[in-house]
Amino acid sequence: MSELKRLHTVTLDKDKCIGCASCIKRCPTEAIRIRNGKASVIYDKCIACGECVRICPSNAKIPSYDKFDVIDAYKYRVALIAPSLYGQFDDVKDINYILTAFKNIGFDFVYEVGIGAELISQVTQRMFAADKLKLPVISTACPAVLELINERFENLRGNLLPLLAPVDVAAKLAREKVAKRGIPSEEVGVFFVSPCPAKVYALKAGKTVKQNYVDGVLSVAEVYMKLVTEIGKLDDSKNLSEMGILGLQWASSGGEAAGAMCEKYLAADGIENVVSILEALENGSLKDVEFIELNACIGGCVGGVLNVENPFVARARIRQMRRKFPQIGTTLAEVGKPTDYFLAEKELERDDQSFGTDRTLAFARLLKIQELYKQLPKIDCGVCGAPSCMAFCEDVVMGRVPNGTTCPIADKERTCDVGEKQ
């Protein structure tokens, strides 16, 4: 799995990296180290949140995604369009122009991920009404948050909403829709235009599906440049949108929670705020809430690092669009699918096995880490190349650094003590 993460999360341009250590302090899972003056990633710990991409002053972190020409491998191409994409465009009064432009850049069909979002909202409402969920329910729409919970807050896994992400639902429905035209499945390529690297990795890894419904994941930024040119050429558009406000509002933080239709909900965005909420939930200090929506990016999906627009501007545009949409574009009754159709198809697997799979060995390693930690200054300065003293201890015990590696600050203090005694 670490190799898959290396290929489909974030890579490093070592020529650009200046070893400034901004990224090691920003990473929420302490997955980055500075070694020999350059950043390096412990991919088993990476949740693909994109924070290192966002914070890097030298643009040395490169998010992974498929290049646009990947669509050429298929005779028929389907574009899956996230609602956050609509907020990237200025002066586009009708989103059907955006959808029509997709057909001019190489796609035969377009399908809105917002439809999948609407259906997930309706299924969530149904499950709440049937009292089938463990409260408080935690949304699983943001794959970076899902990875964070899976690796760092394992005790909360039972609270996760057991449903597919909207993009997986949209991909399933899109494939079925195209199949009804008599087109062989092997000739159809389904491509998601992603606002963030977390969705790239989640779709490549098939985290909650038994088979991948998506064949490629493109970057909003790359596709945007092609769309802008084509939109400017259009005199008219086709009426292609089937989404309502219920799906559109998923583009920004709070939209999913509002769609769940429960009074006691909470929505938080930004990875530091997400961690704070999860810690409060884990220690029992967060109470009297039934649904929790968490997004790693500021503003929600409009804040993804693969987007082109300022997230606050994009969110404002999305809000202004609401008046042009019906409340619900596609209902469960219209698609005729049972609840099981929307359920996650498999349980999450942990990627991070930092201390090994043998519990006895893992416990012994943990004790060694704690003993070593007692000897350190506990100032989390980052001089050693690790983000914290505890992370340094883990690196020593796990053999990630050469034998004999010591804390430079502790060494300096010991040297000073010796000098004073002399």
Residue ranges and their predicted role:
Residues 2-14, 18-43, 47, 51-66, ...:
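Iron-sulfur cluster-binding cysteine motifs and their immediate structural context
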Residues 64-382, 387-422:
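Iron-sulfur-associated redox domains of electron-transfer enzymes in respiratory
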